[in-house]
């Protein structure tokens, strides 16, 4: 049986997409909700200058990323997928979050083969390098870029990515749906 190479984003994909709201509301004295998060870029949602948001992020990024909650069923789904497939985490996180990211995945007991911390949202070169069969993502622009490069993408539904999809992108709503989607896409139950 041929193994699939499955690339998975971290923030907003395996973790709660709105993990930042409470801390941002407290810091910026705002009262935004998940439903207000209709854009990917947080400073735009908060209506604050990028520089001001970046100051906040630099101060709190370790707290934000270490305390994120996993989405429901993530651990069990990835564990099952990892039994017959290669799991690669590919994140746009900055490289200074490398140790924290390894520690987070270990603490949450998420199995994987390799972790790639890119420091950029442009994931196509890494997906090519890994011969990616499927990419699981939350960022609409990343999903579009990957899909236009020929990769199949599963896009987890969020308020900020509800835009038109092309034929290489499949929207899903819960991690427990992933088994069936992978099976249909690759027409082999051995993939899961």
Swiss-Prot record:
The keyword Cell membrane does not apply. One of its GO terms (molecular function) is metal ion binding. It comes from the Bacteria. Its cofactor is Mg(2+). This is Nucleotidase CA_C3379. Belongs to the 5'(3')-deoxyribonucleotidase family. It comes from Clostridium acetobutylicum (strain ATCC 824 / DSM 792 / JCM 1419 / IAM 19013 / LMG 5710 / NBRC 13948 / NRRL B-527 / VKM B-1787 / 2291 / W). The keyword Repeat does not apply. Keywords: Hydrolase, Magnesium, Metal-binding. Its EC number is 3.1.3.-, 3.1.3.23. It catalyses: sugar phosphate + H2O = sugar + phosphate. Catalyzes the dephosphorylation of nucleotide monophosphates and of different sugar phosphates in vitro. InterPro entries: 5_3-deoxyribonucleotidase-like (IPR052419), HAD-like_sf (IPR036412), HAD_sf (IPR023214), Nucleotidase_putative (IPR009206).
């Amino acid at each position: 049986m041929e193994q699939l190479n499955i690339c998975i984003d971290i923030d907003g994909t395996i973790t709660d997409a709105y993990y930042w709201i409470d801390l941002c509301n407290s810091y910026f004295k705002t009262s935004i909700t998940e439903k207000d998060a209709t854009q990917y870029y947080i400073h735009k949602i908060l209506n604050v200058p990028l520089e001001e948001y970046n100051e906040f992020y630099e101060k709190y990024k370790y707290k934000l990323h270490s305390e994120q909650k996993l989405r429901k069923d993530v651990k069990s789904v990835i564990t099952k997928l990892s039994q017959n497939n290669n799991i690669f985490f590919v994140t746009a996180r900055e490289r200074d979050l490398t140790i924290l990211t390894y520690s987070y995945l270990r603490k949450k007991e998420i199995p994987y083969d390799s972790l790639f911390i890119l420091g950029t949202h442009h994931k196509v070169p890494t997906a090519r390098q890994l011969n990616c069969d499927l990419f699981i993502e939350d960022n609409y622009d990343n999903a579009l870029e990957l899909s236009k490069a020929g990769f199949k993408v599963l896009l987890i539904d969020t308020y900020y990515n509800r835009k038109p999809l092309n034929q290489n992108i499949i929207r899903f709503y819960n991690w427990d749906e992933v088994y069936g989607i992978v099976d249909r896409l690759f027409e082999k139950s051995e993939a899961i």
